[in-house]
Amino acid sequence: MLAVSIKNLSHKINNKSILNNVNFELKKDSIACILGPSGSGKTTLLKLIAGLDNVQNGHILINDQEVSSANKHLPTEKRRIGFLFQDYALFPHLTVKENLKYPINFKNSIYKIDDIIDVVKLPDSLDKYPHELSGGEQQRVALARSIISHPDLLLLDEPFSSLDLNLREEIRDDTLHLLQKSNVSTIIVTHDPFEAMFISNQINIMDNNGSIVQSGPPAELYNNPKNQYVTRFFGETNVFNGDVHNSSIKTPVGQIKVDQKYENKNVTVHIRPQGIKLSEQPTPVNGTKGTVMAVSYTHLTLPTILLV
């Protein structure tokens, strides 16, 4: 069974095209990311899935049941979804414990309040109000509240964007653990490619035209990007243009092997930083000589491997 199926979805706001023929599927109990730059229509797509906006063209199915089309709109409260907004939307007049209990009062939940309190990791803050919590603590409470009613589908809109780097990594780890433990189908909107690769089983990359340009597992998109847009979404690359002769192209960093189908054509080659190896030894046959002009430390773009 598919948790979500989006078919030919298009949407306009004030006659401006926001979504353009969007199609994708989410398998049951899996995690998908909608990845794209600001203004690509990610949040609009999430609102349409949630039923917060009406569909103009196309179809949305949840658990194989149509919930939205141009002629049908199932109210949000009947879709069995959880929604975590960017600003968390906690009830300011309720304590942490009361916020967590609120969904249970209206739905039959497989969770009990004590089950979810362990996940929140705030045993000393249950009687505090949201304004007394840090941003990370509020995020934990909001996430737990969205899951406690055991929705069929969980929608997270940029859940980590307001957190500082160190706290973001900690909360992201906790979130992934909770999502895997709860087995809830989840769609996460983000503009951070590394975040998407870490937390999801499937990534759907959107462009500024409101279209999904490529979908697939993180490794597939990283290793086999469909075009330059997808390639550069996962980090900066060294770009070289040239003509293919004898199944190779000559670049400033050496000869690059190219598929024979590009013979005698002008092509663009993208090389990630980790694809270039430096050595003080004599230049190999396919290499080239150069001089290191500067070295700077920014951030890690290579996988971190823990050896035990």
Residue ranges, per PLM feature:
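The feature captures the beta-strand-to-loop junction immediately N-terminal to the Walker
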Residues: 35-37
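Conserved small/polar residues in nucleotide/adenosyl-binding loops
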Residues: 40, 298-304
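Helix-to-loop junction immediately C-terminal to a conserved catalytic motif
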Residues: 50
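Conserved ABC transporter NBD signature motif
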Residues: 58-69
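ABC ATPase nucleotide-binding domains
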Residues: 80-82, 95-229
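Glycine/charge-rich catalytic "coupling/switch" loops of P-loop NTPases
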Residues: 252-295
